[in-house]
Regions:
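Low-complexity, intrinsically disordered segments exposed to solvent
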Residues: 25-205
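Residue-level detector of intrinsically disordered, flexible termini
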Residues: 9-10, 42
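Bacterial N-terminal signal peptides that target proteins for export
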Residues: 2-9
Length: 205
């Protein structure tokens, strides 16, 4: 059964924390709600993992450290700039322990990570651990907010995850991520904390 669900979130995210979402009331829809939350979290995680690959490749200038033999092509003359990460047609065992195949196409409108730059990430016939990932993720660097914290807007449109058994989950999301702790210790990740607000909507399995 497909069920549409909308999430409105406001959360403090720490990389040392684990989150559990619990319904306030137990009812006949509890199983559906649980599946929807799990599917949404799974979809967001897949795109976060994809962006980790993108970020590593872009920051290193194409000297790829996560994959073994992924072919990276960066066109700095194009407008916007374009990067393609090609894992090939067969599963590649990457350094982070995940299997990937297909391509990730990335564009960015200005200097990577600069204020105002918009990064767009699109998987093309892309599979991660045999889950097919579709859709487009857009990240805009908004600079510092009134409190002096770095802020980004992050959106996913036409997101779709197809499981190895053929189950499909679709979603779209719009979020704002604010870096509230850990900026001064760039190389110490354990103290990083982000405040995330926004909405997400989609259909579960």
């Amino acid at each position: 059964m497909k069920n549409k669900i909308t999430f409105i979130s406001a959360a403090l995210l720490s990389i040392t924390s684990t989150f559990f979402l619990n319904s306030c009331k137990k009812n006949d829809n509890s199983t559906v709600a649980t599946e929807s939350i799990e599917d949404n979290a799974n979809a967001e995680t897949h795109f976060d993992m994809i962006f980790d690959e993108v970020d590593d490749a872009a920051v290193s200038g194409g000297v790829y450290s996560r994959g073994k033999t992924a072919v990276i092509t960066i066109d700095t003359l194009a407008s916007p700039r374009t990067m393609t990460i090609n894992y090939g047609d067969s599963n590649m065992s990457c350094a982070d322990g995940n299997l990937r195949r297909g391509k990730i196409v990335v564009t960015w409108t200005g200097r990577y990570r600069a204020i105002g730059t918009i990064i767009t990430v699109t998987p093309v016939n892309f599979f991660q651990n045999d889950f097919k990932i579709e859709g487009t993720k857009t990240i805009e660097n908004k600079g510092r907010n009134s409190a002096g914290n770095l802020e980004w807007t992050i959106g996913v449109t036409n997101g779709k995850v197809t499981t190895p058994t053929g189950e499909i989950h679709t979603w779209s999301s719009n979020r704002t991520r604010t870096w509230v702790n850990g900026e001064s210790t760039r190389f110490i990740l354990l103290d990083d904390k982000y405040f995330i607000t926004g909405t997400s909507t989609g259909t579960n399995r």
